[in-house]
Amino acid sequence: MALLLLSLGLSLIAAQEFDPHTVMQRNYNVARVSGVWYSIFMASDDLNRIKENGDLRVFVRNIEHLKNGSLIFDFEYMVQGECVAVVVVCEKTEKNGEYSINYEGQNTVAVSETDYRLFITFHLQNFRNGTETHTLALYETCEKYGLGSQNIIDLTNKDPCYSKHYRSPPRPPMRW
């Protein structure tokens, strides 16, 4: 279950301007990612694992950095049509921005990119029964790993856990 949570791209919903000069792609200060995050997009080379009821399809609600360097992920995923809340700990590895967790095999979760305020992208590698699965988020990053638009799922339109808690209120009609 823990692996599910990390298998997605996370994007912080914020009313701030994106500045490409603040994007980090190495030497991460992971303590700065603690806070409320919302899953926006997921991509995988095995779409069955991130489709509805897939074992890697999760909706992250919160990430907390621990003093020992590990990360706590608070997320929901679907079990028999119901959103189930789960909290998992991913152990820090020797590599900067990389974590490990056992779930449906051995997994590594690594920060791929972040600006610490508006978005963060995690790259998950799952090794199970001799098969390796890659899962990540945000279209721009996906292409770097050979995952095209056909491998991407928009969680904001399709995920019942997302719509249950985080759907934007209806906007008033525009007046011309």
UniProtKB/Swiss-Prot annotation:
Compartment annotation: Secreted
Which cysteine pairs are joined by S-S bonds?
C83-C161
UniProt keyword annotations, A-Z: Disulfide bond, Glycoprotein, Secreted, Signal, Transport
User: Which N-terminal residues, if any, form the signal peptide?
Assistant: 1-15
What's a single GO MF annotation on this record?
A: small molecule binding
**Sugar-bearing residues?**
N68, N129
- UniProt-listed InterPro entries: Calycin, Lipocalin, Lipocalin_CS, Lipocln_cytosolic_FA-bd_dom, Maj_urinary
In terms of Gene3D superfamilies, this protein maps to: 2.40.128.20
Q: Does the keyword Secreted apply?
A: yes
What cellular component GO annotations does this protein have? Answer: extracellular space
Family annotation (PROSITE patterns): LIPOCALIN (PS00213)
Cited PANTHER family: EPIDIDYMAL-SPECIFIC LIPOCALIN-9, LIPOCALIN
What's the family? Belongs to the calycin superfamily. Lipocalin family.
Q: What is this protein called?
A: Epididymal-specific lipocalin-9
What gene is it encoded by? Answer: LCN9
